Amino acid sequence: MRDVASVQPLAGDDPDAAAALATHVGADLTIVGPEVPLSRGVVDRFSSAGLAILGPTQAAAALETSKTFAKAFMARHGVPTAAYHVSESAEDAVAFLTSGEFGFPVVLKADGLAAGKGVVVAPDAATAHAAVTSIMRERRFGAAGDQVVIEQWLEGAELSYFVLSDGERVVPLGSAEDHKRVYDGDAGPNTGGMGAFAPSPRCDAALERRILDEIVAPVIAGMRAEGHPYRGFLYCGLMLTPAGAKVIEFNVRFGDPEAQVVLPLIEGDLTRILAGAAAGDLRSHSVRLAAACTVGVVLASGGYPDAYQTGKPIEGLEQAGSIPGITLFHAGTALGEDGRLVTAGGRVMTVVARGHDYAEAMSRAYQAVDCIRFEGMHVRRDIGVKALK
């Protein structure tokens, strides 16, 4: 990134510091990536200072920052989702689980932000009760676990669908599928995402039309009707059930690693489109998606998603980047004291390959992955396999 941009140090959870930096550098437009600044009102802070920014307000961001708000909102506006129960105490949660109303498996979600780790799919009562203890009694996620949403388990295939909204209109950005579990074969604990591919082969034109009409349109209209017009990226996490697509979750941002596989497929002047959304006017904007496929593989630090190692030198990036169709998206990286690039987070980077089909994109992605080395590096070796079936 340093080759094409000025990298500025910034505490991402401080709206005042972000606004001060935008003013200092004369930013024409700020695009918010993570959910934490949105939850703390960075868009409201910028707007009050007359600074252009793309993202939902703090109130609109509740679609992601509060599972209880999102479920109640969907109920109010007829958006299809799983049946649910909200518990405000561990005792109530245990009592509801014991009632057997939803049976097992059952899904438990911490109400607030938990870095993608606040969801437990419990196959039995013992696992469900352990999740209640962890979230509500042991306070694993702090205040995010003040409430727990218990959801009826939905059976089907998952996909993610993305749009950009100006508060009234939307521009579709297509679909993707991600791999949340840490190990091959979707084994192990959930993570923020170990890889993704786009577009989803499940999302044909008919399904896309239903998603836009039955899910996206009611959400955008509902937010506007409730006084919180939604501007920015909306990520719809969906389950394709026999009864149709149902919402599992919303993200009020593009999502990671989904953004990395969708962005390389967007053709045209993306900057103009983003500026139009931020200004509340997408009337003359549309997006053309390339007739290609992408596969993105996350390189994770040893120990992730639990306690992980950092400060490990990274090698092989130049060789990986020379492979046709490869883009390297940095995440948890930093410059060490000796000027070498080192690991600085759980998910270190995403290697994205574009190809004519999924097989070519997958082959290129893993060819590039095998060029990169750092101590303890962990990758899944099956990212994209689902698209080949």
Residue map of PLM features:
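Generic C-terminus detector
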Residues: 333-338, 342-389
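Solvent-exposed alpha-helices and their adjacent loops that cap or buttress functional pockets
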Residues: 1-2, 24, 54, 76-78, ...
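Internal nucleotide-binding/catalytic subdomain
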Residues: 118-259
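A conserved helix-loop-beta module that forms one wall/lid of the active-site cleft
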Residues: 54-118
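Active-site "cap" helix and flanking loop/linker of ATP-utilizing ligase/carboxylase catalytic domains
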Residues: 212-234, 251-323, 336
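ATP-binding N-terminal substructure of ATP-dependent carboxylate-amine bond-forming enzymes
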Residues: 1-58
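Short acidic-hydrophobic, aromatic-tinged amphipathic segments that line or gate anion-handling sites
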Residues: 7-13, 85-89, 122
